[in-house]
Amino acid sequence: HTLSLHDALPISSAAAAGSSGAGSSADGSRATKRVTIQDADGERTLEAQELMVAVGRSARTEMVGLDAAGGRTTKSGIAADENQQTSVPHIYAIGDVTGRWQLAHAASADALAAVDHIAGKPNYSNRDIVASCVYTRPEIAAVGMTLDQAREAGHEAVEGAFPIAANSKSSIMGEATGFVKIVSDEKSGAVLGAHLIGPRATDLIAELALAMSAEVTVEEIGATIHPHPTVSEAVMEAIH
């Protein structure tokens, strides 16, 4: 099969190709979808079996009335500080509308931070470290920086990896596709990022997010005995 990627292009229309007008997709198979795009050469129509479209999301703040109350908005959404407090002291904003992490678990953490601030209590959550999860099969999860990003940030970064195919529990489950990659600082051993593809990746990422938040080193993770057989052993093995 052939996969064609077209990014940052305006879409004029998209529809089912229909039995009467269906043509052939790039690999010669029967096309079932049709999309009209605009590129440097003008408007053209593409036909394929499937379309994957990532349209993105933007905050709808114009109807909130925050501007009238003296609040400040940005292109990303409503501006809020680390306590989720806006420029209007009695108004707080959490979650997607702030334009930071558009994730449910991040929004929950924002809410707790806002409530703690209102109640005059300290909040210890580290909302700079937020894992992202994709609930496909195999699952995908990531937190922190990639190897390239870590090096660009000035770290002497290294990466350890372990194939899921070599993990006993994954083989038992019949889900042996994927890997665990852990990015760390070569001198300090600090975990800078982690990227997982495979069974239970969305569960395993919490261990690595905790390591980053608690400043646990890769040596300490590797020295922790992980039970056998479990998918979590892949985290330990990526460090070994």
Residue ranges of model-derived segments:
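FAD-site-proximal beta/loop scaffold in flavoenzymes
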Residues: T45-A119
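Flexible, acidic loop-helix segments that line cofactor/substrate-binding pockets
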Residues: N123-E139
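Short, acidic, Ser/Thr-enriched surface-loop or helix-capping motifs
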Residues: A40, A80-E82, D185-E186
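Conserved beta-strand-loop-beta-strand element in the redox core of flavoprotein oxidoreductases
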Residues: A15-T45, L51
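Internal hydrophobic alpha-helix adjacent to the cofactor/substrate pocket in enzyme cavities
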Residues: H105-D128, H155-E156, A214-V218
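Short, small-residue-biased leader/transition segments that mark boundaries at the very start
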Residues: T2-L9
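Short beta-strand to alpha-helix junction loop
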Residues: A26-S29, A54, G99, Y135-M145
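Flexible, glycine-rich terminal cap/loop adjacent to redox cofactors
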Residues: A119, Y135-H240
